[in-house]
Amino acid sequence: MLGCHSCHDPHGSARIDSTNSVVYPQIGTTFPPIVDSGSYGTVPAAGEAVGVYRLLAWDGYQATGMTDTFDGVPAAIVPSTYNREESATPTRTAYGYGATDGFESWGLWCATCHEGMHETSAGSPSGVVHKTDDVLNGIATNYNAYVKTGDLTGVATASYTSLVPFSTSANGTDIATLAALAVNDGSVADGPANGDRMNCLSCHRAHASGWKYALRWNNEAEFLTLGPPATPVYPGVDAGMGNQGQFNQGYTTAQMEAAYNDRPAGLEFAGHQRVLCNKCHLKD
């Protein structure tokens, strides 16, 4: 049975040292002490270390009752105030890409348990619905141009949305690099570079999604909002649209807004906003 301990090690001793390498204490070795959490951007000085992000499972970790073993830790930094509404500005979790020095990419880390969903390159096997950890290349251009349905005037310096995050590749395990991106005031809104990567969390939440399959948006219908392009509305059951259940999944207008981290419908969406697969794929 899955539990919190399936992904998090409550007594984990893995740590990140001042060279941005993951260190695993072993008998007969010396290693730097942990001086702070590894989740919020503290950069350890020489001879010090911080914990790994969210005490996530590390190389060799196997939870009680599980048969799969993790091969490293993924990289990320989050603002110190993270569990908040996003009615005005997004909470930007800075995900990083790493595959050396004790790190593992987000896609491979998640695939420890979700093997059937993972793919790293084209030519997906039967049943696999999306590749992950791939370099974005031209998809980054799409992401940066996409503002909302009917608007492709975006610029790379203002294109980020926390509804479709991505992994930073350049210095992707460097704490200082990720900490500079992890803001909640909208001051860093840069979208991806061509070398950055999508990951499982680009489309899914790890916890507490309001939508099926732990997705970040309602993917059960073609529209996230209804109404005219300039005045979108969430089609809640209390908005006179209760007969259009595919759009609201039985939620009220307030519940739909809450499922999007308290975003007003007009903050990032157009009327008849299509699903956010289009942030990368431009098919709307």
Language-model segments: residues:
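A motif-centric signal for short, conserved binding hotspots located
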Residues: 1-284
